[in-house]
């Protein structure tokens, strides 16, 4: 298990690209495209996730590529903000590999978050194997998502968070 104290400017050497269990708490993570990526199981608790304006039509926060039996990236009580990104131009994630997973639980989402929330990878035909989930989002970027984004009920969200904490939190 790894713990990163101060977050990272991604993509970087501490980005969760290695297939390990990683834990981030009370830190800021910033980048423009796919800045949280890779095959790790990672828990982000009470972090600020900042998207930097790249002046392209769209940006993506996560690009998970984890194992089918893993937890993927789990964000709990995080604040998704931007540095002047236009409204609706930033997606919470897209699957780098078919089994990528991202869950956003009880997070505050700025207006920069696209109404769809998540996006398929442009050239992938197997994006339906990925798992994108959300529960309890608030803020201007919270919206009804497409059918392929799973809406978790409170019990499902609590169970996912419990499992992610057990797997990722340092002892």
Protein language model features and the residues they cover:
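Sequence-level preference for short, compositionally simple segments enriched
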Residues: 1-171
